[in-house]
Amino acid sequence: MMKSFFLVVTILALTLPFLGAQEQNQEQPIRCEKDERFFSDKIAKYIPIQYVLSRYPSYGLNYYQQKPVALINNQFLPYPYYAKPAAVRSPAQILQWQVLSNTVPAKSCQAQPTTMARHPHPHLSFMAIPPKKNQDKTEIPTINTIASGEPTSTPTTEAVESTVATLEDSPEVIESPPEINTVQVTSTAV
């Protein structure tokens, strides 16, 4: 509440001198003779033409074309040409774009034919790439994907070496090499 009160007081304090000055100027009547307009050099100063041209660009010379940025294939702008798409297919398969007519035939209920901008849409077949047809087809073997009831086992043979060294409680040095036995082990991997 106090903030709004101080705000109002501040605004009044700033605007009262200006309001008093306007009332004093209104007390002096302006007398114009012969329907001449009152013109004061202090109020309307000379405005150079460079200021107007730089301030308002619509009056200035247009060195650049000021067009809005839009896509070439925008369906809402009446361009007679469409850009060719990026080559995602071979050049023989890319459609040839042509200049399309810009008129629409009149409807039967209208007395005279109307000319309207027609916005052609490009054929979208260039976006889909058809599957390649291979001339030399190779035979792909068919695999039976149905699981059988019994898992198949693959026999593998591994060589296992076992070293047997006999230590006795005697202080004699063993001069014979340890015995090496090779055993064939067959396992079934599932």
Swiss-Prot record:
Q: Where is this site: Cleavage?
A: F126, M127
The record, for Pfam families, names:
Casein_kappa
Signal peptide extent:
1-21
List of residues that carry Phosphoserine: S148, S170, S187
Q: Which GO terms describe its molecular function?
A: identical protein binding; zymogen binding
An example GO CC term for this entry is: Golgi apparatus
Please describe, based on the UniProt annotation, the reported consequence of changing T156I.
Answer: In variant G and variant H
Keyword match Phosphoprotein: yes
Residues bearing Pyrrolidone carboxylic acid are Q22
Q: Which residues carry this modification: Phosphothreonine?
A: T166
Instruction: Provide the disulphide bond pattern.
Output: C32-C109
Please give the annotated consequence of changing T157I. In variant B and variant B2
Q: Does the keyword Iron apply?
A: no
Glycosylation, residue list: T142, T152, S153, T154, T157, T163, S170, T186
- Subcellular location per the Swiss-Prot or TrEMBL entry: Secreted
Q: In which tissues is it expressed?
A: Mammary gland specific. Secreted in milk.
What InterPro entries does the annotation carry? Casein_kappa (IPR000117)
GO-annotated biological processes? lactation; protein stabilization; response to 11-deoxycorticosterone; response to dehydroepiandrosterone; response to estradiol; response to progesterone
List UniProt keywords, sorted A-Z: Disulfide bond, Glycoprotein, Milk protein, Phosphoprotein, Pyrrolidone carboxylic acid, Secreted, Signal
- Quote the PANTHER family the UniProt record gives: KAPPA CASEIN, KAPPA-CASEIN
Complex and partners: Monomer or homomultimer; disulfide-linked.
Misc. comment: The sequence shown is the A variant.
Per its database record, what is this protein's job? Kappa-casein stabilizes micelle formation, preventing casein precipitation in milk. Casoxins A, B and C have opioid antagonist activity. Casoxin C causes biphasic ileal contractions through the binding to the complement C3a receptors.
Family statement drawn from the similarity comment of this UniProt entry:
Belongs to the kappa-casein family.
**Name by which UniProt lists this protein:** Kappa-casein
Per the UniProt record, the source organism is: Bos taurus (Bovine)
Q: Which gene name belongs to this protein?
A: CSN3
